Amino acid sequence: MVTAPPEIRSLNGTLRVSLSLRSASGAGGETRYCYVDEHGNLNPTLRLKPGDLLVLKLKNDLSSVPGTMNRRDPPKRDPCASWKMQIASTNLHFHGLMVPPVCHQDDVLNTTLLPQSPAYEYRVRIPANQPPGLYWYHPHPHGHSEEQVLGGASGALIIEGVERFNASVVGLPERLLIFRDQARANAAPVDGRKAPSKDLSVNFVPVPFPDYEPAIIKIKPLQRELWRVLNASADTFVDVHLLTNGRWQNLGLVSVDGVPLRYEQNESKASADGDSTEWVPNVLIPPGGRAEFLYDSPAEGGWTQLLAAGVDTVPVQDEDTPGFVALPGFTPADDDDYTPPRWMVKITARADAPLPASVLPKTVSSVRALLAPLASVYPTRTRKLYFSEKVMDAKNPRGSTVFYLTEEGHVPTAFDPSAAPNITVRQGEVEDWIIENRSQEVHTFHIHQTHFVLLERDKEAVKENYLRDSVDVPYWDGLSKQYPSVKLRIDFRGAAVVGTFPYHCHILQHEDGGMMGTIQVLAAGEKRSK
């Protein structure tokens, strides 16, 4: 049975919580990770309002990973100082929040907590103009992010107020679903069925291979709810479809990556008299992405199944396909990461089902004026970046791979934490970035501290009424004359972006493998260093 994660809400403008990151060995020998608060709650959901202060004390209590045993004295070092990330080190990223990339707020480049270090305090002021919606927190120690997120270290962070931007959600019950992936100890086929590269869970209810027994939710009949769905997977895409009583059901899309649809169009007053919902057949959520949508339950005794559809992450062609060009190290889809379709959740309509504990307000407050819509702002400049990969030993395609995210005109180089920022811009600017995928597996572009609007896919205009912080870029199929690409308009107007922060592939195996760069945003009057 799927249950809601424990919640902690802000009180009188402040949310205070102490989290301990702990580890333990799983049944298959894997290391599991979890945040535990002072009351014993696991991976609690943090709920705040725009303008609130988050005071979070984080303690690194890892004990079941290499490098954490036999330490007697706490390490004497400044956790804010640049430090080589280790498998036993950790930090915290507030994914999607528009807060400064500095020590004690949202810095992941220099902040490193080692086991037995004193508790480290984050003090994060939620901006008054932070879009209301679903965000999340997770560890971000470069080189070891995948290990900790794949092990389960993540939690939701909800900024209240979505009802101010969409009349259709006012007063609705809300339900939070968190998808997480987990490495499989045994990848052997069963009865001729290929095992997925990773299993998935819903709110820590496992839906494992080979039976994929779905998690269960009971819901009131003919009930509309706002579902907040977080893909907290390290590496796995979740393509959400709903099948109700044998027929496909549309989703009422309300928000993407924490931002309500048409958010920028609500400049001076609440939209409680307007419905910005878009009804769609499915929603593809990349690793780290979020989607919030309306779900209408069936009548008494009816059922809905939530399908995580299969996602092709590499070309289905092989070397025998006419005209196909295989890059060094390419392996066919059947031999690579495998993401099959899975029935993840079965929802049954029962009159005795409890309502979710969280219900959106029935009254709506005013909305602050916003900046000009991003898509309408003329960009300061345009850049092109591209994803690429290099297998270290071409004779061993299963060997070590280095991942790159490179600005056009520069030599591909794996992320180096000691290097100067790859890109420098000035606060107040807006840039267009074209992101190409020159590799033969899918990637997900993510940038910290800000959002962007998707303008084009493969040079074709896209009309989206929402902002994002992550977007998928499909693989090059080995046949097309042009690489898959997206064109993004990225917002550097907000004051919180000043500083240095990363952009990277949010498939964390790739990010850990070097597919990351840094951008320095100078204050409006600050001079560029020579």
Label the predicted regions.
Residues 118-124, 215, 281, 289-293, ...:
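Short strand-edge motifs at loop-to-beta-strand transitions and within beta-strands
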Residues 7-9, 155-172, 178, 330-335, ...:
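Extracytoplasmic/periplasmic copper-protein system
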Residues 99-115, 183-363, 460-462:
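Histidine- and aromatic-rich segments of cupredoxin/plastocyanin-like copper-binding domains
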Residues 127-165:
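Hydrophobic or amphipathic alpha-helical targeting/insertion segments
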Residues 1-114, 119-121, 192-227, 232, ...:
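N-terminal, post-signal-peptide metal-ligating segments of extracellular/periplasmic oxidoreductases
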Residues 143-149, 310-321, 509-515:
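Short acidic/polar inter-strand loop motif in beta-rich domains
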Residues 28, 79-114, 249-281, 325-328, ...:
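Active-site pocket scaffolds in enzymes
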Residues 125-131, 296-302, 493-498:
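Short, surface-exposed loop/turn segments at beta-strand-coil junctions that are enriched for proline
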